[in-house]
């Protein structure tokens, strides 16, 4: 354990290099009591509801408790990777859920590849409306 973590009485801190656009270094300290981030609250947030992105994706909350979103249209490539249990499926479900809440079936079509036939089974009922054919 480093001196900084002992002074802050935490097990882990993450130090980021110079923060973009600021002359500062970022220090992230985990909350002592983690909170669940509800996708329902994020979808119901004013920021998500009033968003004008072409393909809005709400991923969660920032360390300053703001809704974190991005426009999938401005993301030409997206690689989702990680070890077992790291949240890949949760992230993909957040993307799909965001799009389902903001787009009508006439505006959005999905092509879902699920080799295990488990990850996307909960979307089976939606396929007749959102499946690209």
List each model region and its residues.
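Nucleotide-binding motor/catalytic cores of P-loop/tubulin-like NTPases across gene-expression machines
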Residues: 12, 35-36
